[in-house]
Each structure stands twice: as C-alpha cells, then as structure tokens.
Amino acid sequence: MPRRDLVRIVLVGDDGVGKSSIITSLIKEAFVTNVPHVVPEVTIPPEITPENFTTSIVDTSSNPRSRPHLLSSISRAHVICLVYSIADPSSFDRVAEYWLPLFRREGINVPVILVGNKIDLRGGRVTNQGLEDESAPIMREFKEVETVVECSALLPLNVSEVFYFAQKAVLHPTAPLYDSREHTLKPKCLEALKRIFTISDVDKDGLLNAHELNQFQQKCFSTPLQSQELDGILEIVRSYDPYAVQPLPSSSPNTPLSRDSSYGQLHYFNNNVVPPSPPQEGITELGFLYLHTMFIQQGRMETTWTVLRKFGYGESLDLREDFLAPKFDVPSDCSVELSPLGNQFLTDIFEAYDKDQDGALSQNELDDLFSTSPGNPWLSQGFPDTTITDDMGRVTLQGWLAQWSMTTLLNHRTTLNYLAYLGYSSSPATDLPTPTALHVTRPRKQDRRQRKVTRNVFLCYVLGATGSGKTSLLRSFVNRPFKGGEDGLGGYEPTTKVLSVVNSVEMEGVEKYLVLQEFGSKYESEILRNSKRLDMADIIIYVHDSSDTNSFSYISNLRQQYSLDHIPSIFVATKSDLDLAQQRHEVQPDVYCRRLGLQAPMAVSSRLGPLHNLWVAITRVALDPTSSLPRGPRSQMSPAQRIRVVARWGLAATTISAIVAVWMKWQGYSFKGIWGWMAKFAGLRT
C-alpha cells in the first residue's frame, strides 16, 4: 500500500466543547470570539507540511439534524479527534459511554485522538501521571485510541500539537506496531524488525557493531551516527539488559575511527597519532528490538516507521509490491543476466554465511541465508542437484553463482524478488534499486547478424527419444555420478517434469554458463509448439542412443513435425561404450547431419565420462550460432517469417501473371495463345 498523499482529520464531540474554536485557532493562530456552529472544511496544502501531504480538516455537529453529515464524515475519516471539555466532566464521560461505541457500531476503524479542550478553565494543576491515570481505562478498553492531548483554543495552547498527533496517527500509526494492552511489539512488527537486524548485521556475527550501526543510521536517516550517540545507545540497551550488549568476536571488522568524528567515516593521520577505536561491543537482536519498543512507548513511532519503510515495508508490514517486483522491461529476443553488482552481492552474501569458511554452504548455512525470505526458491526443482556441489552435496560458490545465473535467465522476476528479500537494496556495498543487479543483453538477432555474441548465459534444449540418455547428460554436466545398472541397464527413470541444470564452461579464460533443459515426453510437444518458448533457446541438442536402432527416427520425426531450423543445433550420439547399431532411418545420422550442413553427431558415453569436449563444443556453437544453423542462412528465419516470405512471393507471382495476361490480351492474344507464348518463352516447347 503506497504512502498517503492526503490526511483527512474529522473533529467530533458534544456541542459546546470547542471543536470549531480549535480549528479557527489553528488557522488564525489566535482565538476567535465569534465562530460558526460548524466551520467549513479546511484544506492545508502539501507545501506547508514537512512530509508533503495535503491535510483536510472537517468539523461536525452532534445535533441530531446533522447526524447524516456526522456519519458521512467519520466514514471517510483517516483519523478522528474526539474532543471533550475539561470544564464539563459529562463530556468526558460520554467519550466512553457514547462516542467510542458509536464508532464501533458504524464500523469505523481509524485511529482516535482524545482531545481535552479548555485547560485554561481547569482549577489546579494536573500532572502527566494524573492525566495518564485518568485516560488509561479508556485506552485499555478502546485500542483505537492512540493518545490523549490537552489544549486550549483560547490561549491558544497545544492547538498545533492536536493536529500534529492526528497526522502522525495516520502516517505513523501505533496499532500495526504495538499492542498497548500487552505492552509488546506485535508479531508482524517483531518479524520485520528481526529481518532488518539480520540484513543490517553485515558480517553475520549476531551483533550490530559501530560500523554497522552507522551504516544503518545513514541508510534510514541520511545522517552519520556520532560517537556520543553510539555510546548513549549502548548505555541505554545495557541498562535494559546487560546481555543485550556483547563483546565483538575477534574476527568482526570494526573499523577504527576518530572519536571526534562519526563512526563509519574513515580518517587518515600523518602525525603517528593512533585514534581511539570505537567500542569493541555490539548490540544483540534483543537490544535492537528493545530500542524500537522504547521509541514506540515514548511516542516516537515515526522512528520505527522510517526504518520499516526504508527496508521496503508498507502500511500492512508486508514488503511492498514495488519493492519486491520493480518495473523491469525486457525487449523481445533479449535475455537477462546478473550484472557485476549482482554477482558481487551474491558472492558477498555467500561468503558471509559460509561460517566455517570451507567454500561451501551446508544445509544449516543455507537455511540461515534464506531466513530473511520465504525460503529456498529452488526446493521443488531438485536443488542442489541442479548445480555444482562439493563431494558432500553442499553448494559451492561456483554452483551458487551458476544457480542464480540460471534463475535470472529463466525467470528474472524470481531473482528480483530474492535480491529484495536478501537485502540487496539495503547492502552497504550497493544501497541501490534491485534492477541494478541485473543486465539486459543485446538481441540474439543482432548478435547473429554481427557474428559477435556478447552474452554469458545460454539456454540449451535437450531433445531426444525416451531412454536416449538425456538425463544422464544433464547429470554428467553437473558432475553427478552415472545412475545406470550393469552394462548401462537397470538404472533408467523416465523424466516426468522439466529438468534444468547449470554449470560454467571456461572459454579462453572467460566463464560462460550453459543451462540445459530436458522436458520429458509430457511437456516436450507443448514447449515446441510455443513460439515464445522456442525463441528463448540458444541451442537445441538432439540426442539419440547410438545402440538403439529406433532412437534416431524420433529426432527426424520431431524435426519434420516442428519448425526448428532457425535454432542453432548440435547432434549427440550417446552410449558410445555400447555396440553401434544401424539406425532404422532412410539415411544414417552422419549423412543426415551433413545434408543439414552440420557436424556429424558427437559420440559420448555418460557412463565412461567426462564429457568436457562436448560442453566446449556446445559453448562454441553458442558463441558462433550462425555456424550451426541447419541448412544455412535461410534457416535463421522463424516459422512466422517463412510464412510471410512465401506469402510475399506468392503475391508477387500472382501480380506478375495478372499483368502479363492483361498485356497479352491487349496485344490481341487469346488465352490459349498466352499460355503457348509463356511456354515457348520458358523454353518448355519447341
């Protein structure tokens, strides 16, 4: 939900309590003796308020004849100022007996500010404690009551504060954050603040040190944290709970800074004077939560709301849609990759959660990493078997970056979501919108036309008959062991869902990522009929079992059934460790490929492995796609383009024939003579 640009304040209460006088005192900045019974609606323009929103102030009457206007006004209110007269105790009694129950009966669910007017008529002094004791029973029973303000329209005194608290109740409401009955943070607020603490804890040591607190302060309030302020924060938290302030681990980076400066601002000294270090202590999550509880209890809700909004939260304490899914347009024929900033952020977060520094993320480390998000986005896709892991099945940095490269290529929206969840926009290294972590590539057609591919991630569709060894190829690509039984038999499992794997291939010192997708018989035809899905493919890998006489026919039939010649292709003959079988096809695979102008099928064995030469060959095709287009340059046209070309030639031929016919008729030829003339012209008749 976006921030409001209008705050509608409605004043309600018994007649004679001074509602109209409060409004006129605000506008005139002085008491006005003769005021209308109901003041017309007042609009305060946005430039008057520091937060740049329009304020509308509506007066009402409790007269029964004005009841429709009263009910209409409170139904459209963003906040209600319920006014009573300190000089008339019965008007205070009616707050709980009449007015607040009326709001509930009418289904009004907005903040209420209790306003005690005419304090100039009170006899004797009332302490803050006395005022709190008087209003506490009402606030306990009616949670919609945000605060109590006393004022005098006559003096005037505290009049502007009435409207300040009313505006604040709308822009920075207490109800979503704090349970005033239990005196605790509400669950959603607690969850959000815990996530913010985790993201702000850059080194993931469970503490916010001086450097991290300064970065937090800069992000949320655009001002550095002074050393005295930090000392005060530590003292406040320590007085609440000594265990909420802990010594920093020896490995925690806490940059030494000048004590007369702000933490986080680095100074260099040439006089050999070593500046004092910042406190070697940090606040725990408990201490961080206590600070925000204290802010709210002190009426400083705007502090907590500023923090929440800076970290992407909306009024409902959910991450905003525009924060999770910002506008990011991808032109047709282009793909999306991680930018250098995105790669660096994902590298940094991997290293931060690799607590044992063994170069791989265990399951517990992965769980911690995704704790600020809805969870691991790849669980249903077979992760971590989709990428590179160590011998114990733990994802490595290479596999981690490869997995994100695949995710970004296949569904960049997921990457944008998770960059937000993981704190990219809150990272001290970036503090930039999440789209800066992504990069839109040049169109494929432009790459092919200029014969220079600028992309780094390529999508390869793996097609072939059931049992041809497609899944084994995918497993081999991510260094998974061969699953076949004796003599390659007994280990076959049919593919029932889309399988995607990713790995990098080094070409002349540069890493390129290949994403291999297998669809299985259930989804293959659906993909091949979908022109948009086909256009996403950089390469088609046609796989046949060289030991199965019927395997290659499947590929030939597939190519006849679907228009695939506009996609670069490579043919692979699997199970080369078994006896070569003569294919039941009009021509053998090598001849078939030669007729297409392609290399003969590469013979491979997933059982014997490794298949490095195959991956290099596929990457070469990706980098020089025009060299592997079936039947040469004409095949670069998509099926739709071919239809348009044929239609244009057909139209041209029809037009020419019509012109010739008209001309010949004008010359006096009969149609029989015309066809004879045309045949003679074509050399078909002697």
From Swiss-Prot:
Cytoplasmic side: 1-648
A Gene Ontology molecular function term of the record: calcium ion binding
Ranges of residues in domain Miro: 4-172, 455-624
Mitochondrial intermembrane domain ranges by topology: 666-686
Record Pfam families: EF_assoc_1 (PF08355), EF_assoc_2 (PF08356), Ras (PF00071)
Residues that hold GTP 2 according to the record: 464-471, 506-510, 574-577
Keywords: Calcium, GTP-binding, Hydrolase, Membrane, Metal-binding, Mitochondrion, Mitochondrion outer membrane, Nucleotide-binding, Repeat, Transmembrane, Transmembrane helix
The protein's name in its UniProt record: Mitochondrial Rho GTPase 1
Organism annotation: Cryptococcus neoformans var. neoformans serotype D (strain JEC21 / ATCC MYA-565) (Filobasidiella neoformans)
